[in-house]
Amino acid sequence: MRESSQIRETTETKIKLSLQLDEGKNVSVQTGVGFFDHMLTLFARHGRFGLQVEAEGDVFVDAHHTVEDVGIVLGNCLKEALQNKEGINRYGSAYVPMDESLGFVAIDISGRSYIVFQGELTNPKLGDFDTELTEEFFRAVAHTANITLHARILYGSNTHHKIEALFKAFGRALREAVERNAHITGVNSTKGML
């Protein structure tokens, strides 16, 4: 089974995270940031991933360190769980509607970290979650997992719905990208490596 568990401890956060790419039944998320817990749970459920997250952070300051560090550990776990990347689709994309909002995510498990994030988040805060942390989370995942990630909010008026559409699209796009494909021998690259 493709899986990884990691712990990251700094003076600002303590993150314990486990990711299972092939087993999506066990999802448990506790970061101390309610809206972020909800988004990570949606990502895992819609991607059919197992995900267990326990995070303690300096949320008395704000949620920035917690959200970013969870993204770093998730990216590291993804990179480790993918092993040599043989036989996977490599690419994945998904459009996800959430009522009036439409989100899109495209992923290339390329070995090159890059992110494009487009979207207007008009409400600056949802509960204790600063909405600008949405981009910070995706940036941290893309950087540490060495993937190319494009995330775009095409339209919408409700900030909660916009972010929810992105996290669901992220799960669905990543599921497609990591899926094993019987028609692919080795890695899906003319270079012979990713």
UniProtKB/Swiss-Prot annotation:
- The EC code for this enzyme is 4.2.1.19
Q: Identify the GO cellular component terms for this protein.
A: cytoplasm
| Reactions mediated catalytically | D-erythro-1-(imidazol-4-yl)glycerol 3-phosphate = 3-(imidazol-4-yl)-2-oxopropyl phosphate + H2O
One GO BP annotation is: L-histidine biosynthetic process
What enzyme class is recorded for this protein? lyase
Tell me, in one coarse class, where this protein mainly resides.
cytoplasm
- Biochemical pathway: Amino-acid biosynthesis; L-histidine biosynthesis; L-histidine from 5-phospho-alpha-D-ribose 1-diphosphate: step 6/9
Assigned keywords, A-Z:
Amino-acid biosynthesis, Cytoplasm, Histidine biosynthesis, Lyase
**Highest taxon of source:** Bacteria
Q: Name one GO molecular function term.
A: imidazoleglycerol-phosphate dehydratase activity
Please indicate if the UniProt record lists Lyase as a keyword. Answer: yes
Q: Which Gene3D superfamilies match?
A: Imidazole glycerol phosphate dehydratase, domain 1
Pfam family name, one: IGPD
Q: Where in the cell is it found?
A: Cytoplasm
- Matches recorded under PANTHER family: IMIDAZOLEGLYCEROL-PHOSPHATE DEHYDRATASE (PTHR23133:SF2), IMIDAZOLEGLYCEROL-PHOSPHATE DEHYDRATASE HIS7 (PTHR23133)
The family line of this record is:
Belongs to the imidazoleglycerol-phosphate dehydratase family.
Q: What is the designated name of this protein?
A: Imidazoleglycerol-phosphate dehydratase
Q: Which organism is it from?
A: Bacillus thuringiensis (strain Al Hakam)
